[in-house]
Each structure stands twice: as C-alpha cells, then as structure tokens.
Amino acid sequence: MAVPKRRTSRSNTRSRRSQWKAKVPTLAKCSRGHVIRPHTVCGTCGRYNDRQVLDV
C-alpha cells in the first residue's frame, strides 16, 4: 500500500476540506406564491405548472 512521503501541510488540508461544504438548496415560487423546490408539485396547494395535480 502507498505511504505518503511528506506530511500534508495544514494549508493544503484545509483547502481540500473547504470543498466539503453543503450546498444551499435552490428555491422557486409556485404560481400562488408558495416557496417550493424547482420542478416539483407544491405541497401546500397541489399545483404544478399552473395545473391542479394533487387534491390537498
């Protein structure tokens, strides 16, 4: 198994770990103004693309 020849510096370690952050979820508004995830049915009013698709 390969073994590191040199110790990884604190700067390189922290630079690599800075990419581990969580992404902020993208949000959109449905036609009635509720905040939803894009391309999903609104859980509050049951509409998708200005059509009623769920009975809520």
Curated annotation (Swiss-Prot):
Q: What species was this sequence derived from?
A: Frankia casuarinae (strain DSM 45818 / CECT 9043 / HFP020203 / CcI3)
- Positions of the region Disordered? 1-24
The record ties this protein, via InterPro entries, to: Ribosomal_bL32, Ribosomal_bL32_bact, Ribosomal_zn-bd
Q: Name one GO biological process term.
A: translation
According to the UniProt entry, which residue ranges have a biased composition of type Basic residues? Answer: 1-20
Q: Name one GO cellular component term.
A: large ribosomal subunit
Q: GO molecular function: any one?
A: structural constituent of ribosome
Xref: NCBIfam families: rpmF_bact
PANTHER family for the chain: 50S RIBOSOMAL PROTEIN L32, LARGE RIBOSOMAL SUBUNIT PROTEIN BL32
What protein name is recorded for this chain?
A: Large ribosomal subunit protein bL32
- Residues folding into a coiled coil are none
The record's comment on protein family reads: Belongs to the bacterial ribosomal protein bL32 family.
Keywords annotated in UniProt: Ribonucleoprotein, Ribosomal protein
Q: Which HAMAP family match?
A: Ribosomal_bL32
